[in-house]
Amino acid sequence: MKLYDNGVAVLGCGNLGNAIAKGLVASKQFKSNQIVLTKRNLSTIEPLKREGYHVTTSNHDAVSRCKIVIVCVVPAQLDDLLDSIKQSVTENHIIISVVSGASIEDIRSHLEKDVPIVRAMPNTAIQHCQSMTCLAIRSSHQKSTNSPSDKAKDNALEVAKKIFNCLGMSIVLSEEQIVPATALCACGIAFFCRAIRAAAQGGCEIGFHAEDAIRIAAQTAKGAATLLLENNFHPEYEIDKVTTPQGCTIAGLNQMEHAGFSSAMIKGIVTSSDKAASLYTQKQQNKKQQQLKQQQHQQHQHQQHQQHQQQVQQQEPHQYQQQQQQSHQQSQYNQGHNYGHQNQHHHNHDDQHQNYYNQDQKRRNNRKHRSNENYDNHHHHNQQYQQHQQPTQQESQEQTQQPEQTQSTNQSNQRRNSESRNGKSPQKQPQKQSQVQQPSSTTENTDQQQQQQPPQEQQQQQEQPQQPQEQQQQPNVVDEAERPKEQQQQPQQQQQTIDKKGYNNNRRGGRHYSYNNNYNSHHHRHNGINKNSSSMYHDEKRHEVKTEQIN
């Protein structure tokens, strides 16, 4: 960046900073490209950029590019601004401060450098090169010497006078008078404008238009100021020239004085001066009070700590040593805890990767396990179907043979009944034929026993009263050797129930749903055949009982 030897940086381009920048260009002592303006919000000073001014938000860049720095911020923003330019300020810079209430020593101590600082108090008329600027370089009790620092201060004062004389008029005062000058010089613009406005309102009341009244009042005030500045007379001298005996001027002045015109102006200026003195110092006082409170609090804590140590030392020595060891262990633990806390992020990152890997392995194992289970279930269903198909074929063959056996048993029963009526003893049949034609129920076995009994016992049985039908229908107990076919039917029925339970439990697998449905329909058909065969058996049994009752 190019450092302009005669360049000016205006930090804080508000109303006053904007007026100073335009006044510098209007004085023809500076060009617009030699002035750098800074502000937080650049939208308000964007038109100045089109006029050739350098605009930025960085105070550091502005100070590094210019030798003369004019600080134009409000007192509340001064500390932050000084912090931002502390590193870029050198002893070759000239700092001109227009901040109300901030002394030279406050600014120098904050910058921590022996930089020449000039306090200035202009007004907004500087825009038209009509400002009255008050300057100060040192306090009243300080005197100029031939030291390098004093020479640098005097040189800085001459540069400031040269700048502000081009913008109006300047006067050198002591630093103690800068605060009252703020009320009279800077605030005076507002006071005199209010007086001009009051005069314009009076002109409207007596018949003038507002614009005409303001123009007449403002030009009259300018003429009055010119008379005082050019002639260097007292204001009362000019007043006496205007007033005449029993005239209108003296009548109006007297009415203003009765209303308190002069006293109101005086009171307003004094009040403004008092307030200007406390703008920055009040903030500093608040900071000092806070610092004092902190110091007092620290001292109080230090005293309490010392008292506690004295009490501990007065105790037994071993207790004191134990407390020291505990404090040392606690400090070591805290250091280790802090180190672990710093590395906690890395450990957590590794744990997350390990968890992701474990979850992936679990998912893969579950998929393998499910596929193996499905394969086993499918194989088990095939085995069940094959086992179930074999007994159904055997039962179908038995059912075809069963009607022939029933016909033979009916014929034998009819023959026995006819012989019993005629009084003939039944003929004994050979054992081979009985073994071939085995009855399917226990009632046929009882008939064979009756045939083997002698005729006397048969007559006694006929003489006995007939038992109820329910008792007659109960099957007689036979030995296990005489009914081998019943032993074969019981395991088949148990196998069917086991297969049915296994089918119902295995039906939950979703992959073999269609196969299981076929198996289920076949199983119900088989159950239907068993039901029909059992019903045929009971019908034959009832028929035999009826024939016995008739006999």
Curated annotation (Swiss-Prot):
GO terms for biological process: L-proline biosynthetic process. Residues 279-551 are annotated as: Disordered. Signal peptide: none annotated. It holds the Pfam family F420_oxidored. It catalyses: L-proline + NADP(+) = (S)-1-pyrroline-5-carboxylate + NADPH + 2 H(+); L-proline + NAD(+) = (S)-1-pyrroline-5-carboxylate + NADH + 2 H(+). Keywords: Amino-acid biosynthesis, NADP, Oxidoreductase, Proline biosynthesis. Residues 282-298, 306-342, 383-415, 424-441, 448-475, 487-496, 503-520 have a biased composition (Low complexity). Its EC number is 1.5.1.2. It comes from the Eukaryota. Pathway: Amino-acid biosynthesis; L-proline biosynthesis; L-proline from L-glutamate 5-semialdehyde: step 1/1. GO terms for molecular function: pyrroline-5-carboxylate reductase activity. It is an enzyme of class 1 (oxidoreductase). Residues 537-551 have a biased composition (Basic and acidic residues). Homodecamer; composed of 5 homodimers. HAMAP family: P5C_reductase (MF_01925). Belongs to the pyrroline-5-carboxylate reductase family. This is Pyrroline-5-carboxylate reductase 1.
